[in-house]
Amino acid sequence: MRVLIACEYSGKVREAFRALGHDAYSCDLLPSDDNSPFHLTRDCWDVIENRFSTLRGGWDLIIMHPPCTALAVSGNRWYGSGMPKHQQRLDSIEWTMALFEHAKKHAPRVAFENPVGVLPIKPTQYIQPWQFGHPESKKTGLWLHNLPPLVETDN
């Protein structure tokens, strides 16, 4: 399966898919932490649309990690209504929602994650790391298109 992990420079998710035998790539405006040849230092909009000739064919799955700084409710102190960075929040909401729609036009299955935030559409589900074998707690929303909700592996 051809997989794109957008807005990722760590390579962690990309490498997990590659370890399972998928043709996975990551992209971000930043270079990858692991200097992988499977990371594209490009704008995710272009990579989603495959506007370059490096890869043939489209994506089967796109997973996105859009920046959450302005979107998370934890930032209300700086990004809330009437605050100096409120317009940045509004721009981030518009960008993230447009990116989700853009990805859905270019792949049959799409997911993106973000912590509890201010996006205008509710996530398909909320998950916690402890539901999947990690001791941390961080409520995270998943917006899924043509994908089933995750089923917890630990509780």
Walk through the language-model features, giving the residues of each.
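Conserved active-site and SAM-binding loop architecture
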Residues: 1-155
